[in-house]
């Protein structure tokens, strides 16, 4: 694709007709006739009308390409069932062909190929001296069965990389564990408060550098979601499309408030099926919780801490960053991506002379038993005792109710210079 194409709604969201017109125009410029195309898409933990784009890609490419397939950029999330995939893509009862859809498996070495290394010198430069190690770059080798890669994905503020989307759908979306664990821990060391909603971060630099080692044609459709629809869409290289999407995401997905809150009821939507994914309900709110305040993750539907990493989290629990950094020898056997998740959920705080003092009291109001919540070093509330109405419309009292948490970032007015 020679140059960026974009379409932003001046009203609420783009209509299906507008999206169809945009995709037709953008795809007309891409040389994929007779070629095999692999489309990399998010899983169901991201809000996006994938069913619309599944239909549009069929209409625009189905007759042009030799093969059209999809790869779900799961990172370390659990594989999706056939039924869940059909729901996400709107395939149940549809006359659209059932194109092949693959789940990425980060933990299956047979699925991965090493495509290079990020050198110790590069790591030292990018991290400002925080880290000094050679990092191998592995990616799902399925991509090399195809002639052209397309990324079809939303962009939101993100706790590890700053803003999601773009090359993040390669790393960690369809990558191996080494680079994933490395840059998640790098993000955790810099901290969620510093990274989230910041456009260019050291972690984004790692992601883009790793993606530069993929020697295949790549086209990215980066979009910004408003509600359940598409506010804007950008087509181009992964770097360029993401760059513009991140700017629009900063306008649409960051809510500024005057002063911090003492208590937040953060409601996790059903798309978050465990604390691993529902942790976003903390990440997006941490910047507006006062020191000593409380955040409640309200999710009666959640029964598990992490379907993938629960064993490790049961062992280490949730702690502030310095709890790990000051005794890393004790946690060398734990994947650093798990340590990163732990400290992101727990939030900022101190660990001095063996005493841990978090800045925020994070409480789970889920179907996870109290005993397990205490064991993993989080608070517990019985969700059945919570009257949601009692939290509504009390912002002037320092109490915030967030009915669908996890995608909108909250910041204080004095943080408006963070882009």
Task: Locate each region found by the language model.
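Extended hydrophobic packing segments that form well-structured cores
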Residues: 6-7, 16-20, 355-419
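Glycine-rich phosphate/diphosphate-binding loops that line cofactor/substrate pockets in enzymes
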Residues: 23-38, 61-65, 142-145, 214-215, ...
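Short glycine-rich or small-residue beta-strand-to-loop segments that form or flank ligand, phosphate
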Residues: 36-46, 69-75, 151, 264-268
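Histidine-anchored nucleotide/phosphate-binding helix
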Residues: 46-68, 278-289, 296
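Short internal beta-strands
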Residues: 66-77, 294-300, 363-365
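Long, charge-dense
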Residues: 69-122, 319-340
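Conserved, well-structured core segments that form the ligand-binding/active-site neighborhood
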Residues: 99, 103-260, 287
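C-terminal catalytic subdomain
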Residues: 273-363
């Amino acid at each position: 694709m020679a140059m960026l194409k974009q379409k932003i709604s001046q009203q609420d969201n783009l209509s299906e007709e507008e999206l169809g017109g945009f995709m037709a125009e953008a795809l007309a410029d891409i040389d994929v006739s007779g070629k095999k195309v692999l489309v990399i898409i998010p899983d169901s933990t991201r809000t996006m009308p994938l069913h619309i784009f599944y239909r549009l890609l069929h209409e625009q490419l189905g007759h042009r390409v030799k093969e059209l397939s999809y790869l779900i950029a799961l990172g370390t999330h659990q594989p999706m069932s056939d039924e869940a995939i059909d729901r996400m893509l709107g395939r149940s009862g549809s006359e659209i062909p059932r194109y092949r859809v693959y789940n990425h498996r980060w933990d299956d070495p047979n699925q991965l190929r090493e495509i290079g290394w990020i050198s110790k010198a590069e790591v030292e430069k990018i991290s400002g001296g925080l880290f000094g190690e050679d990092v191998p770059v592995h990616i799902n080798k399925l991509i090399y069965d195809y002639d052209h890669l397309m990324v079809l994905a939303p962009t939101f503020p993100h706790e590890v990389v700053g803003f999601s989307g773009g090359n993040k759908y390669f790393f960690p979306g369809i990558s191996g564990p080494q680079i994933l664990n490395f840059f998640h821990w790098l993000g955790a060391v810099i901290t969620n408060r510093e990274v989230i909603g910041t456009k260019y971060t050291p972690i984004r630099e790692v992601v883009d550098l790793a993606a530069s080692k993929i020697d295949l044609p790549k086209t990215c459709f980066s979009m910004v979601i408003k509600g359940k629809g598409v506010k804007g869409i950008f087509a181009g290289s992964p770097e360029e499309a993401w760059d513009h999407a991140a700017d629009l995401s900063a306008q649409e997905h960051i809510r500024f408030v005057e002063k911090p809150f003492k208590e937040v009821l953060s409601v996790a939507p059903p798309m978050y099926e465990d604390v691993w994914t529902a942790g976003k309900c903390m990440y997006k709110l941490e910047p507006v919780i006062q020191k000593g305040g409380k955040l409640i993750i309200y999710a009666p539907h959640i029964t598990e801490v992490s379907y993938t990493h629960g064993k490790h989290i049961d062992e280490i629990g949730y702690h502030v960053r310095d709890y790990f950094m000051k005794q890393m020898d004790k946690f060398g056997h734990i994947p650093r991506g798990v340590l990163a998740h732990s400290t992101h959920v727990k939030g900022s705080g101190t660990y001095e002379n063996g005493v841990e003092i978090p800045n925020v009291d994070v409480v789970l109001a889920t179907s996870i038993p109290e005993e397990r919540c205490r064991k993993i070093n989080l608070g517990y509330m019985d969700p059945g005792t919570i009257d949601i109405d009692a939290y509504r419309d009390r912002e002037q009292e320092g109490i915030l109710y967030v009915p669908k948490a996890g995608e909108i970032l909250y910041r204080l007015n004095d943080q408006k210079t963070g882009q």
